[in-house]
Curated annotation (Swiss-Prot):
<dbReference type="GO" id="GO:0008616">
    <property type="term" value="P:queuosine biosynthetic process"/>
</dbReference>
<dbReference type="GO" id="GO:0005829">
    <property type="term" value="C:cytosol"/>
</dbReference>
<comment type="subunit">
    <text>Homodimer. Within each dimer, one monomer is responsible for RNA recognition and catalysis, while the other monomer binds to the replacement base PreQ1.</text>
</comment>
<keyword id="KW-0479">Metal-binding</keyword>
<keyword id="KW-0819">tRNA processing</keyword>
<dbReference type="InterPro" id="IPR002616">
    <property type="entry name" value="tRNA_ribo_trans-like"/>
</dbReference>
<comment type="pathway">
    <text>tRNA modification; tRNA-queuosine biosynthesis.</text>
</comment>
<dbReference type="InterPro" id="IPR036511">
    <property type="entry name" value="TGT-like_sf"/>
</dbReference>
<dbReference type="Pfam" id="PF01702">
    <property type="entry name" value="TGT"/>
</dbReference>
<dbReference type="InterPro" id="IPR004803">
    <property type="entry name" value="TGT"/>
</dbReference>
<feature type="binding site">
    <location>
        <position position="143"/>
    </location>
    <ligand>
        <name>substrate</name>
    </ligand>
</feature>
<dbReference type="GO" id="GO:0002099">
    <property type="term" value="P:tRNA wobble guanine modification"/>
</dbReference>
<feature type="region of interest" description="RNA binding">
    <location>
        <begin position="245"/>
        <end position="251"/>
    </location>
</feature>
<feature type="binding site">
    <location>
        <position position="302"/>
    </location>
    <ligand>
        <name>Zn(2+)</name>
    </ligand>
</feature>
<protein>
    <recommendedName>
        <fullName>Queuine tRNA-ribosyltransferase</fullName>
        <ecNumber>2.4.2.29</ecNumber>
    </recommendedName>
</protein>
<dbReference type="GO" id="GO:0101030">
    <property type="term" value="P:tRNA-guanine transglycosylation"/>
</dbReference>
<feature type="binding site">
    <location>
        <position position="187"/>
    </location>
    <ligand>
        <name>substrate</name>
    </ligand>
</feature>
Length: 381
Protein backbone atom coordinates (compact mmCIF):
# COMPACT_ATOMS: atom_id res chain seq x y z
CA UNK A 1 0.00 0.00 0.00
CA UNK A 2 1.14 3.51 -0.82
CA UNK A 3 -0.43 6.75 0.42
CA UNK A 4 -0.25 9.91 -1.69
CA UNK A 5 -1.20 13.25 -0.12
CA UNK A 6 -2.45 15.44 -2.94
CA UNK A 7 -3.64 18.65 -1.29
CA UNK A 8 -4.85 20.10 2.00
CA UNK A 9 -7.40 22.66 3.16
CA UNK A 10 -6.72 23.62 6.76
CA UNK A 11 -6.13 20.29 8.53
CA UNK A 12 -8.24 18.42 5.99
CA UNK A 13 -6.39 16.17 3.56
CA UNK A 14 -7.18 14.99 0.04
CA UNK A 15 -5.21 11.91 -0.92
CA UNK A 16 -5.29 8.39 -2.27
CA UNK A 17 -4.42 4.91 -1.06
CA UNK A 18 -2.90 2.74 -3.77
CA UNK A 19 -3.27 -1.03 -3.49
CA UNK A 20 -2.67 -3.87 -5.91
CA UNK A 21 -6.45 -4.36 -5.89
CA UNK A 22 -7.30 -0.75 -6.65
CA UNK A 23 -7.11 2.90 -5.63
CA UNK A 24 -9.06 4.42 -2.73
CA UNK A 25 -9.67 8.16 -2.93
CA UNK A 26 -9.53 9.78 0.50
CA UNK A 27 -11.19 10.91 2.70
CA UNK A 28 -13.03 7.59 2.40
CA UNK A 29 -15.85 5.78 4.17
CA UNK A 30 -15.72 1.98 4.46
CA UNK A 31 -19.01 0.06 4.66
CA UNK A 32 -18.92 -2.72 7.24
CA UNK A 33 -19.21 -6.34 6.10
CA UNK A 34 -19.03 -8.08 9.46
CA UNK A 35 -19.58 -11.65 8.27
CA UNK A 36 -18.17 -11.22 4.78
CA UNK A 37 -21.25 -9.38 3.54
CA UNK A 38 -22.63 -5.87 3.72
CA UNK A 39 -26.03 -6.94 5.03
CA UNK A 40 -28.55 -7.52 2.25
CA UNK A 41 -26.25 -6.29 -0.52
CA UNK A 42 -24.36 -8.00 -3.34
CA UNK A 43 -20.76 -6.84 -3.89
CA UNK A 44 -21.85 -5.29 -7.19
CA UNK A 45 -24.54 -3.25 -5.44
CA UNK A 46 -22.06 -2.08 -2.81
CA UNK A 47 -19.62 -1.03 -5.52
CA UNK A 48 -22.40 0.85 -7.34
CA UNK A 49 -22.90 3.06 -4.25
CA UNK A 50 -19.35 4.33 -4.75
CA UNK A 51 -17.69 2.23 -2.03
CA UNK A 52 -14.01 1.63 -2.76
CA UNK A 53 -12.97 -0.46 0.25
CA UNK A 54 -14.82 -2.64 2.76
CA UNK A 55 -14.26 -3.58 6.38
CA UNK A 56 -14.39 -7.21 7.48
CA UNK A 57 -14.52 -8.50 11.04
CA UNK A 58 -11.67 -10.80 12.05
CA UNK A 59 -13.33 -12.04 15.24
CA UNK A 60 -16.61 -13.10 13.65
CA UNK A 61 -15.01 -14.59 10.52
CA UNK A 62 -12.61 -16.57 12.72
CA UNK A 63 -15.52 -18.09 14.65
CA UNK A 64 -17.64 -18.57 11.51
CA UNK A 65 -16.78 -19.93 8.97
CA UNK A 66 -13.20 -20.22 10.27
CA UNK A 67 -9.75 -20.03 8.70
CA UNK A 68 -9.86 -23.43 7.00
CA UNK A 69 -13.09 -22.74 5.11
CA UNK A 70 -11.70 -19.36 4.08
CA UNK A 71 -8.49 -20.93 2.75
CA UNK A 72 -10.50 -23.43 0.66
CA UNK A 73 -11.71 -20.45 -1.37
CA UNK A 74 -8.40 -18.58 -1.38
CA UNK A 75 -9.06 -15.65 0.94
CA UNK A 76 -11.86 -13.32 2.02
CA UNK A 77 -11.93 -11.56 -1.37
CA UNK A 78 -12.57 -14.87 -3.13
CA UNK A 79 -15.02 -16.05 -0.47
CA UNK A 80 -17.30 -13.02 -0.69
CA UNK A 81 -16.51 -12.03 -4.30
CA UNK A 82 -15.39 -8.50 -3.46
CA UNK A 83 -12.28 -7.80 -5.49
CA UNK A 84 -11.44 -4.36 -4.16
CA UNK A 85 -9.35 -3.67 -1.03
CA UNK A 86 -10.48 -4.95 2.38
CA UNK A 87 -9.49 -3.72 5.85
CA UNK A 88 -10.02 -6.13 8.73
CA UNK A 89 -10.17 -5.14 12.37
CA UNK A 90 -8.08 -7.23 14.73
CA UNK A 91 -10.92 -8.71 16.78
CA UNK A 92 -9.91 -6.70 19.84
CA UNK A 93 -13.05 -4.57 20.06
CA UNK A 94 -15.35 -7.60 19.87
CA UNK A 95 -13.36 -9.57 22.45
CA UNK A 96 -13.34 -6.70 24.91
CA UNK A 97 -17.06 -6.15 24.45
CA UNK A 98 -17.72 -9.68 25.77
CA UNK A 99 -17.51 -8.41 29.35
CA UNK A 100 -17.60 -11.08 32.04
CA UNK A 101 -16.96 -14.02 29.69
CA UNK A 102 -13.41 -12.90 28.90
CA UNK A 103 -10.16 -12.65 30.88
CA UNK A 104 -7.32 -10.35 29.84
CA UNK A 105 -3.71 -11.41 30.45
CA UNK A 106 -0.38 -10.12 29.18
CA UNK A 107 -0.36 -12.92 26.62
CA UNK A 108 -3.81 -12.19 25.20
CA UNK A 109 -7.47 -12.75 25.95
CA UNK A 110 -9.18 -15.95 27.11
CA UNK A 111 -12.90 -16.02 26.43
CA UNK A 112 -15.92 -18.21 25.81
CA UNK A 113 -17.05 -18.63 22.24
CA UNK A 114 -20.40 -16.78 22.22
CA UNK A 115 -21.71 -19.29 19.66
CA UNK A 116 -21.02 -22.64 21.40
CA UNK A 117 -19.36 -21.84 24.74
CA UNK A 118 -15.94 -23.28 23.83
CA UNK A 119 -12.88 -21.83 25.57
CA UNK A 120 -10.82 -19.78 23.08
CA UNK A 121 -7.63 -17.73 23.25
CA UNK A 122 -6.85 -14.74 21.03
CA UNK A 123 -3.44 -13.08 21.06
CA UNK A 124 -1.67 -10.48 18.92
CA UNK A 125 0.10 -13.31 17.10
CA UNK A 126 -3.10 -15.24 16.42
CA UNK A 127 -4.85 -12.11 15.16
CA UNK A 128 -2.02 -11.52 12.67
CA UNK A 129 -2.28 -15.13 11.48
CA UNK A 130 -6.05 -14.94 10.98
CA UNK A 131 -5.82 -11.66 9.09
CA UNK A 132 -3.02 -13.10 6.94
CA UNK A 133 -5.30 -15.99 5.95
CA UNK A 134 -8.11 -13.51 5.23
CA UNK A 135 -5.82 -11.77 2.74
CA UNK A 136 -6.57 -8.39 4.30
CA UNK A 137 -5.16 -5.45 2.36
CA UNK A 138 -5.01 -3.51 5.64
CA UNK A 139 -4.35 -5.49 8.82
CA UNK A 140 -5.04 -3.92 12.21
CA UNK A 141 -2.87 -4.63 15.25
CA UNK A 142 -4.42 -6.41 18.23
CA UNK A 143 -5.03 -3.93 21.04
CA UNK A 144 -7.25 -3.32 24.03
CA UNK A 145 -10.06 -0.94 23.22
CA UNK A 146 -10.07 1.11 26.42
CA UNK A 147 -13.65 1.49 27.67
CA UNK A 148 -15.25 4.81 28.54
CA UNK A 149 -15.26 6.04 31.18
CA UNK A 150 -11.82 4.96 32.38
CA UNK A 151 -9.73 6.71 35.01
CA UNK A 152 -6.20 7.85 34.13
CA UNK A 153 -4.47 4.91 35.84
CA UNK A 154 -6.56 2.29 34.05
CA UNK A 155 -6.22 4.10 30.72
CA UNK A 156 -2.42 4.23 31.21
CA UNK A 157 -2.14 0.50 31.94
CA UNK A 158 -4.40 -0.32 29.01
CA UNK A 159 -2.48 1.92 26.60
CA UNK A 160 0.89 0.51 27.71
CA UNK A 161 -0.30 -3.06 27.19
CA UNK A 162 -1.62 -2.10 23.76
CA UNK A 163 1.86 -0.78 22.90
CA UNK A 164 3.44 -4.07 23.95
CA UNK A 165 0.87 -5.93 21.89
CA UNK A 166 1.60 -3.59 18.97
CA UNK A 167 5.26 -4.71 19.01
CA UNK A 168 4.18 -8.35 19.06
CA UNK A 169 1.71 -7.73 16.23
CA UNK A 170 4.45 -6.08 14.16
CA UNK A 171 6.87 -8.95 14.81
CA UNK A 172 4.41 -11.70 13.85
CA UNK A 173 3.20 -9.76 10.80
CA UNK A 174 6.81 -9.55 9.59
CA UNK A 175 7.49 -13.22 10.35
CA UNK A 176 4.54 -14.16 8.13
CA UNK A 177 6.15 -12.09 5.34
CA UNK A 178 2.83 -10.34 4.84
CA UNK A 179 3.23 -7.88 1.96
CA UNK A 180 0.07 -5.94 2.78
CA UNK A 181 -0.31 -2.95 5.13
CA UNK A 182 -0.29 -2.99 8.94
CA UNK A 183 -1.89 -0.15 10.91
CA UNK A 184 -1.17 0.79 14.51
CA UNK A 185 -3.98 1.90 16.84
CA UNK A 186 -3.54 4.94 19.10
CA UNK A 187 -5.11 4.54 22.55
CA UNK A 188 -5.15 6.60 25.74
CA UNK A 189 -8.84 7.37 26.28
CA UNK A 190 -9.59 11.10 26.68
CA UNK A 191 -6.17 11.89 28.20
CA UNK A 192 -3.89 13.90 25.91
CA UNK A 193 -0.69 12.94 27.74
CA UNK A 194 -1.47 9.23 27.31
CA UNK A 195 -2.30 9.74 23.65
CA UNK A 196 1.11 11.41 23.25
CA UNK A 197 2.88 8.35 24.64
CA UNK A 198 0.83 6.04 22.43
CA UNK A 199 1.52 7.97 19.22
CA UNK A 200 5.25 8.17 19.89
CA UNK A 201 5.49 4.50 20.79
CA UNK A 202 3.64 3.41 17.66
CA UNK A 203 5.62 5.70 15.36
CA UNK A 204 8.84 4.32 16.86
CA UNK A 205 7.69 0.77 16.02
CA UNK A 206 6.69 1.89 12.54
CA UNK A 207 3.40 1.22 10.76
CA UNK A 208 1.90 1.83 7.33
CA UNK A 209 -0.95 3.86 8.80
CA UNK A 210 -2.34 4.92 12.16
CA UNK A 211 -5.83 4.54 13.57
CA UNK A 212 -7.31 6.56 16.41
CA UNK A 213 -9.05 4.02 18.61
CA UNK A 214 -11.03 4.29 21.82
CA UNK A 215 -13.29 7.08 20.53
CA UNK A 216 -17.00 6.89 19.72
CA UNK A 217 -17.35 4.65 22.78
CA UNK A 218 -19.64 6.97 24.75
CA UNK A 219 -17.46 10.00 25.37
CA UNK A 220 -18.86 13.51 24.72
CA UNK A 221 -18.38 14.79 21.17
CA UNK A 222 -16.27 17.63 22.52
CA UNK A 223 -13.77 15.09 23.85
CA UNK A 224 -13.63 13.26 20.54
CA UNK A 225 -12.96 16.51 18.69
CA UNK A 226 -10.35 17.58 21.24
CA UNK A 227 -8.46 14.28 21.01
CA UNK A 228 -8.50 14.34 17.20
CA UNK A 229 -7.22 17.91 17.19
CA UNK A 230 -4.43 16.87 19.53
CA UNK A 231 -3.46 13.55 17.96
CA UNK A 232 -3.75 14.00 14.18
CA UNK A 233 -0.93 16.56 13.82
CA UNK A 234 1.43 14.08 15.55
CA UNK A 235 0.83 11.33 12.99
CA UNK A 236 3.40 11.36 10.16
CA UNK A 237 2.04 13.35 7.24
CA UNK A 238 2.82 10.58 4.74
CA UNK A 239 0.71 7.99 6.57
CA UNK A 240 -3.08 7.60 6.43
CA UNK A 241 -5.19 8.33 9.52
CA UNK A 242 -8.19 6.18 10.37
CA UNK A 243 -10.92 7.02 12.90
CA UNK A 244 -12.41 3.69 13.94
CA UNK A 245 -16.15 3.10 14.29
CA UNK A 246 -17.29 6.60 13.30
CA UNK A 247 -20.05 7.45 12.67
CA UNK A 248 -22.85 9.89 12.01
CA UNK A 249 -22.57 12.13 8.92
CA UNK A 250 -21.58 15.11 11.06
CA UNK A 251 -18.90 12.98 12.75
CA UNK A 252 -17.37 12.28 9.35
CA UNK A 253 -17.40 15.98 8.49
CA UNK A 254 -15.75 16.88 11.81
CA UNK A 255 -13.18 14.11 11.44
CA UNK A 256 -12.22 15.33 7.97
CA UNK A 257 -11.91 18.92 9.25
CA UNK A 258 -9.40 17.63 11.80
CA UNK A 259 -7.27 15.60 9.40
CA UNK A 260 -8.81 12.11 9.29
CA UNK A 261 -8.58 10.11 6.04
CA UNK A 262 -10.62 6.96 6.71
CA UNK A 263 -13.82 6.02 8.54
CA UNK A 264 -16.03 2.99 9.09
CA UNK A 265 -19.34 2.44 10.85
CA UNK A 266 -22.37 0.16 10.83
CA UNK A 267 -24.64 3.20 11.13
CA UNK A 268 -25.74 3.61 7.49
CA UNK A 269 -26.64 -0.07 7.13
CA UNK A 270 -28.08 -0.64 10.61
CA UNK A 271 -30.13 2.54 10.50
CA UNK A 272 -31.39 1.63 7.02
CA UNK A 273 -32.85 -1.62 8.34
CA UNK A 274 -34.62 0.40 11.05
CA UNK A 275 -36.12 2.88 8.58
CA UNK A 276 -33.79 5.72 9.61
CA UNK A 277 -32.64 7.27 6.32
CA UNK A 278 -30.07 10.02 5.78
CA UNK A 279 -30.99 12.73 3.29
CA UNK A 280 -29.49 16.04 2.22
CA UNK A 281 -31.68 17.97 4.67
CA UNK A 282 -31.26 15.65 7.64
CA UNK A 283 -33.10 12.42 8.40
CA UNK A 284 -36.27 10.74 7.15
CA UNK A 285 -37.85 8.22 9.53
CA UNK A 286 -39.67 6.35 6.82
CA UNK A 287 -41.98 4.39 9.10
CA UNK A 288 -43.64 7.65 10.19
CA UNK A 289 -47.28 7.74 9.04
CA UNK A 290 -46.82 11.08 7.29
CA UNK A 291 -44.97 9.32 4.47
CA UNK A 292 -47.77 6.86 3.58
CA UNK A 293 -49.02 9.05 0.70
CA UNK A 294 -45.79 10.96 -0.10
CA UNK A 295 -45.08 10.35 -3.79
CA UNK A 296 -41.81 12.30 -3.83
CA UNK A 297 -38.43 10.55 -4.00
CA UNK A 298 -36.63 9.94 -0.74
CA UNK A 299 -34.01 12.59 -1.56
CA UNK A 300 -34.36 14.67 -4.72
CA UNK A 301 -30.61 15.40 -4.64
CA UNK A 302 -29.63 11.71 -4.58
CA UNK A 303 -28.80 9.64 -7.68
CA UNK A 304 -29.05 6.19 -6.06
CA UNK A 305 -31.19 3.37 -7.46
CA UNK A 306 -33.75 3.83 -4.70
CA UNK A 307 -34.23 7.56 -5.21
CA UNK A 308 -34.34 7.21 -9.01
CA UNK A 309 -37.11 4.63 -8.94
CA UNK A 310 -39.26 4.68 -5.80
CA UNK A 311 -41.39 7.05 -3.75
CA UNK A 312 -41.32 7.66 -0.03
CA UNK A 313 -44.81 6.12 0.09
CA UNK A 314 -43.52 2.87 -1.42
CA UNK A 315 -40.59 2.72 1.00
CA UNK A 316 -43.01 3.40 3.87
CA UNK A 317 -45.25 0.58 2.63
CA UNK A 318 -42.34 -1.89 2.43
CA UNK A 319 -41.19 -0.94 5.92
CA UNK A 320 -44.66 -1.36 7.42
CA UNK A 321 -44.98 -4.78 5.76
CA UNK A 322 -41.50 -5.86 6.92
CA UNK A 323 -40.56 -6.65 3.33
CA UNK A 324 -36.92 -7.58 2.72
CA UNK A 325 -36.85 -5.31 -0.32
CA UNK A 326 -37.47 -2.32 1.94
CA UNK A 327 -34.32 -2.97 3.95
CA UNK A 328 -32.34 -3.47 0.75
CA UNK A 329 -33.55 -0.26 -0.90
CA UNK A 330 -32.96 1.68 2.32
CA UNK A 331 -29.43 0.28 2.58
CA UNK A 332 -28.62 1.17 -1.02
CA UNK A 333 -29.70 4.74 -0.33
CA UNK A 334 -27.90 5.21 3.00
CA UNK A 335 -24.63 3.81 1.63
CA UNK A 336 -24.90 6.06 -1.41
CA UNK A 337 -25.60 9.04 0.85
CA UNK A 338 -22.37 8.37 2.77
CA UNK A 339 -20.36 8.00 -0.43
CA UNK A 340 -21.84 11.20 -1.88
CA UNK A 341 -20.94 12.98 1.36
CA UNK A 342 -17.33 11.80 1.10
CA UNK A 343 -17.13 12.75 -2.58
CA UNK A 344 -18.40 16.22 -1.69
CA UNK A 345 -15.78 16.57 1.03
CA UNK A 346 -13.02 15.46 -1.35
CA UNK A 347 -14.10 17.99 -3.97
CA UNK A 348 -14.37 20.79 -1.40
CA UNK A 349 -10.82 20.12 -0.20
CA UNK A 350 -9.54 20.08 -3.79
CA UNK A 351 -11.17 23.46 -4.42
CA UNK A 352 -10.05 24.97 -1.11
CA UNK A 353 -13.69 25.45 -0.11
CA UNK A 354 -14.09 22.99 2.75
CA UNK A 355 -15.49 25.49 5.24
CA UNK A 356 -18.06 26.64 2.66
CA UNK A 357 -19.10 22.99 2.33
CA UNK A 358 -19.28 22.68 6.13
CA UNK A 359 -21.49 25.77 6.48
CA UNK A 360 -23.88 24.50 3.80
CA UNK A 361 -23.96 20.99 5.30
CA UNK A 362 -24.93 22.20 8.78
CA UNK A 363 -27.45 24.72 7.45
CA UNK A 364 -29.21 21.93 5.56
CA UNK A 365 -29.43 19.57 8.55
CA UNK A 366 -30.29 22.41 10.94
CA UNK A 367 -27.47 21.99 13.44
CA UNK A 368 -24.78 24.38 14.75
CA UNK A 369 -21.20 24.03 13.51
CA UNK A 370 -18.85 22.62 16.18
CA UNK A 371 -15.93 25.01 16.67
CA UNK A 372 -12.41 24.08 15.64
CA UNK A 373 -9.53 24.63 18.02
CA UNK A 374 -7.76 27.95 17.45
CA UNK A 375 -4.69 26.22 16.01
CA UNK A 376 -6.88 24.40 13.48
CA UNK A 377 -8.61 27.63 12.48
CA UNK A 378 -5.18 29.18 11.98
CA UNK A 379 -4.16 26.25 9.79
CA UNK A 380 -7.03 27.06 7.46
CA UNK A 381 -5.91 30.65 6.91
Amino acid sequence: MKYELQTTDGRARRGRLIFERGVVETPAFMPVGTYGTVKGMTPEEVKDTGAQILLGNTFHLWLRPGQEIMKLHGDLHDFMQWHGPILTDSGGFQVFSLGDIRKITEQGVHFRNPINGDSIFLSPEKSMEIQHDLGSDIVMIFDECTPYPADWDYAKRSMEMSLRWAKRSRQRFDELENKNALFGIIQGSVYEDLRDVSVKGLVDIGFDGYAVGGLAVGEPKEDMHRILEHVCPQIPEDKPRYLMGVGKPEDLVEGVRRGVDMFDCVMPTRNARNGHLFVTDGVVKIRNAKYKDDVSPLDEHCDCYTCRNYSRAYLHHLDRCNEILGARLNTIHNLRYYQRLMAGLRQAIEEGKLEHFVVDFYQRIGKPIPPLAEKDVAAGN
